[in-house]
From Swiss-Prot:
Encoding gene (name): uppP
Other noteworthy facts: Bacitracin is thought to be involved in the inhibition of peptidoglycan synthesis by sequestering undecaprenyl diphosphate, thereby reducing the pool of lipid carrier available.
Lineage of producing organism: Bacteria, Pseudomonadati, Thermodesulfobacteriota, Syntrophia, Syntrophales
Function per UniProt: Catalyzes the dephosphorylation of undecaprenyl diphosphate (UPP). Confers resistance to bacitracin.
Membrane-topology descriptor: Multi-pass membrane protein
Major enzyme class: hydrolase
Entry protein name: Undecaprenyl-diphosphatase
Transmembrane segments annotated in the record for this chain: 9-29, 95-115, 150-170, 178-198, 245-265, 289-309, 320-340
InterPro entries listed in its UniProt record: UppP
Length: 343
């Protein structure tokens, strides 16, 4: 996997969004278009959303911001007549929201496959710990690999906990007041500036600092800090991968370890969101998408996520996050221009 593959992935993403935007103009000229809440997702639309989800979920550029743009361009979401404290909001569409969350399963499966050795290590550690408890033996009976796997599992669960609690308490508030163009634009710009600043001050200017290169060598306080920072990503447009990667750099991980922990942390975080949303809105999801569209979205999301993760790791080995920060700021400008015409 070479660095030009990341450029190819971004070109595919741009093409998918441009196709969606062009469809929005043709749909706008058609008078018989159904309301977004009644629109059934076509297979080709599912493929576009799968590309957008798969590429943007792990790149630090905000999957939510891209999905809001693509969903609206495809006529699947609409603006509300009411305004929130940060401007116009999107009409709540449980089926569409659930579809965007459920196709995250493709991205989850991508990380499960790419980091299967880490996953096996954690499962081995968990099974070893359970065996020790059942047999009432000492924890010292665990092997080195089992102890490392158990520790990594503990690090991930600790980092996942803040988002789980905050999400349960404030999920409705976030959906009610923050799912709109301006909150996403603010988050894209703030995240872009933050990414550029953190890389400059915590990475480029601190090259000689001894950093952790193996996630198994992390301390629990570092995992907790990353988890607390992950809460910020619940603001639409922030990017979960962006905020967790820069949090990793701040606490002393090197670039690759920060990315790896971010990818692994996606397993419980995205997994919980996918299961909850799929269970809660399954009937609406089945009515609006259908099994074929859902399967296509999942498959495309998985394939593009595999490509994106491999390309990102290769890119970060030789480059950094600053180009993504610049991209976020440019994307914010595109979103402002696009949504201004629909005001």
């Amino acid at each position: 996997m070479k660095k030009h593959h990341l450029r190819h992935a971004l070109l595919v993403l741009s093409a998918a969004i441009l196709l969606a935007v062009s469809c929005s103009f043709s749909a706008a000229s058609a008078s018989a278009s159904p309301p977004a809440s009644e629109k059934k997702i076509a297979v080709w639309e599912a493929a576009i959303l799968g590309v957008v989800e798969g590429i943007t979920e792990y790149l630090p550029i905000s999957s939510t911001g891209h999905l809001i743009l693509a969903s609206h361009a495809l006529g699947m979401t609409q603006f509300s007549e009411t305004r929130g404290p940060l401007g116009t909001l999107m009409v709540k569409n449980d089926a569409m929201d659930s579809y965007n969350i459920v196709i995250q399963l493709g991205a989850i499966l991508a990380v499960l496959g790419l980091y299967r050795k880490r996953v096996k290590q954690m499962l081995k550690g968990l099974s070893g710990a359970l065996a020790v408890l059942v047999s009432r033996r000492s924890v010292t009976a665990l092997g080195d690999s089992e102890r490392q796997g158990l520790k990594l599992l503990g690090l991930l669960l600790l980092a996942f906990l803040p988002a789980a609690v905050f999400g349960k308490l404030f999920h409705e508030v976030i959906e009610t007041y923050l799912f709109g163009p301006l909150p996403v634009v603010y988050a894209l710009v703030a995240g872009g500036v933050l990414m550029i600043g953190v890389e400059y001050f915590f990475w480029l200017k601190d090259r000689n600092r001894l950093r952790i290169s193996d996630v198994n060598s992390m301390f629990y306080r570092q995992a907790l800090f990353i988890g607390m920072m992950q809460v910020v990503s619940m603001w639409p447009g922030t990017s979960r991968s962006m905020i967790t990667m820069i949090a990793g750099l701040i606490v002393g991980l090197d670039m690759i370890a920060a990315a790896e922990f971010s990818f692994l942390l996606a397993l419980p975080t995205l997994g919980a969101a996918t299961l909850y949303s799929g269970y809660k809105n399954w009937h609406a999801l089945d009515d609006s998408a259908g099994m074929l569209a859902l399967a296509v979205g999942l498959a495309v999301s998985w394939l593009t996520a595999v490509i994106a993760v491999k390309a990102l790791v290769r890119w970060l080995t030789h480059h950094g996050l600053i180009p993504f920060g610049v991209y976020r700021i440019l994307l914010a400008g595109v979103l402002l221009i696009y949504f201004w015409q629909w005001r």
